[in-house]
Curated annotation (Swiss-Prot):
<dbReference type="InterPro" id="IPR005139">
    <property type="entry name" value="PCRF"/>
</dbReference>
<keyword id="KW-0963">Cytoplasm</keyword>
<dbReference type="InterPro" id="IPR000352">
    <property type="entry name" value="Pep_chain_release_fac_I"/>
</dbReference>
<protein>
    <recommendedName>
        <fullName>Peptide chain release factor 2</fullName>
    </recommendedName>
</protein>
<dbReference type="InterPro" id="IPR045853">
    <property type="entry name" value="Pep_chain_release_fac_I_sf"/>
</dbReference>
<dbReference type="Pfam" id="PF00472">
    <property type="entry name" value="RF-1"/>
</dbReference>
<dbReference type="GO" id="GO:0016149">
    <property type="term" value="F:translation release factor activity, codon specific"/>
</dbReference>
<comment type="function">
    <text>Peptide chain release factor 2 directs the termination of translation in response to the peptide chain termination codons UGA and UAA.</text>
</comment>
<keyword id="KW-0648">Protein biosynthesis</keyword>
<dbReference type="GO" id="GO:0005737">
    <property type="term" value="C:cytoplasm"/>
</dbReference>
<keyword id="KW-0488">Methylation</keyword>
<feature type="modified residue" description="N5-methylglutamine">
    <location>
        <position position="252"/>
    </location>
</feature>
<comment type="similarity">
    <text>Belongs to the prokaryotic/mitochondrial release factor family.</text>
</comment>
<dbReference type="Pfam" id="PF03462">
    <property type="entry name" value="PCRF"/>
</dbReference>
<dbReference type="InterPro" id="IPR004374">
    <property type="entry name" value="PrfB"/>
</dbReference>
Length: 365
């Protein structure tokens, strides 16, 4: 005989949590909007305005993630209840186990949707840029920056996000000096925004013939892609624009002409660059878009810093402080803000970052 009461309690709990989410996520309004968006996308002339069509497609995906999941929850809970009734009537343990397995899957799906409540920021749903910069330390630091690049690319791939290398500067011997990656997907910035900061690596260096232990640092900076109509004033006199021949990853096909563009915002020292297109004009547009996004993020960070009375250390506003330590010799990676720790270092370097990201988001960082 099997225990039916705990399963019924679980069904009731999931039903109540699902109802709470329907209200919190404004299910009715989203369902109505989804119908409107679908109708617009079915219009034959919708692709006469490609940018609007793409925006509608992205909005549809975001709406479906809520509406479809809640619809599936409702139907799934009804199906599980039906299976349980059959299992009890027939005293069939196999059917009972099938119902329990389906219930576990529904609970996991609901937990993922509940996690969206963490994404309450204005730009959490936006695509984002990730800048990785090697610290001082030459080849060792540049190799570490390359390892971080691979880690974030693997993480993005695992979440189904699209990635694009906007600019990459190769290291002198190995690794990279810097890279800018555009990451596109549902709540890309919301997921990654707490990753801004300094990442510390401790390991026996493969570049040291004596096999000595080295400590290296690389910085990550995450900022959202902002709408073109966002009100950010940039004085053209504050910008220095340089063009140069592209080289390295993302630029192999354009290195015969000075198509790469670097823009420096003189008052803040912020630099953006792009070399992934044959057209200098397109590279300049992309670099300006990044500049706008970086200045917006800087302004938001300044406001947050003021709230926390941290104006005395403005250097932390741009890059943040040390957030995570990767000690490979001891097989230990620890988040210094949340205390989350793991010994499965290879899995993390292969992109298994969710435990760290989820903990930092739940902590409200």
């Amino acid at each position: 005989m099997f225990e039916i009461n705990p399963v019924n309690n679980c069904i009731q709990d999931l039903t109540e949590r699902s109802d709470v989410l329907r209200g919190y996520l404004d299910y009715d309004a989203k369902k109505e909007r989804l119908e409107e968006v679908n109708a617009e996308l079915e219009q034959p002339d919708v692709w006469n305005e490609p940018e609007r069509a793409q925006a509608l497609g992205k909005e549809r995906s975001s709406l479906e993630a809520v509406v479809d999941t809640l619809d599936q929850m409702k139907q799934g809970l009804e199906d599980v209840s039906g299976l349980l009734e059959l299992a009890v009537e027939a005293d069939d343990e196999e059917t009972f186990n099938e119902a329990v397995a389906e219930l576990d899957a529904l609970e996991e799906k609901l937990a993922q949707l509940e996690f969206r409540r963490m994404f309450s920021g204005e730009y959490d749903s936006a695509d984002c840029y990730l800048d990785i910069q090697a610290g001082s330390g030459g080849t060792e630091a540049q190799d570490w920056a390359s390892m971080l690049e691979r880690m974030y690319l693997r993480w993005a791939e695992s979440r189904g996000f699209k990635t694009e290398i906007i600019e990459e500067s190769e290291g002198e011997v190995a690794g990279i000096k810097s890279v800018t990656i555009k990451i596109s997907g549902d709540y890309a910035y919301g997921w990654l925004r707490t990753e801004t900061g300094v990442h510390r690596l401790v390991r026996k260096s493969p570049f040291d013939s004596g096999g000595r232990r080295h400590t290296s640092f690389s910085s990550a900076f995450v900022y959202p892609e902002v709408d073109d109509d966002i009100d950010i004033e940039i004085n053209p006199a504050d910008l220095r624009i340089d063009v140069y021949r592209a080289s390295g990853a993302g630029g192999q096909h354009v290195n015969r002409t000075e198509s790469a563009v670097r823009i420096t915002h003189i008052p803040t020292g912020i630099v953006t660059q792009c070399q992934n297109d044959r057209s200098q004009h397109k590279n300049k547009d992309q670099a300006m878009k990044q500049m706008k996004a970086k200045l917006y993020e800087l302004e938001m960070q300044k406001k947050n810093a003021e709230k926390q009375a941290m104006e005395d250390n403005k250097s932390d506003i741009g890059w943040g402080s040390q957030i995570r330590s990767y000690v490979l010799d001891d097989s230990r990676i620890k988040d210094l803000r949340t205390g989350v720790e793991t010994r499965n270092t290879q899995a993390v370097l292969d992109g298994s970052l969710d435990q760290f990201i989820e903990a930092s988001l739940k902590a409200g960082l």
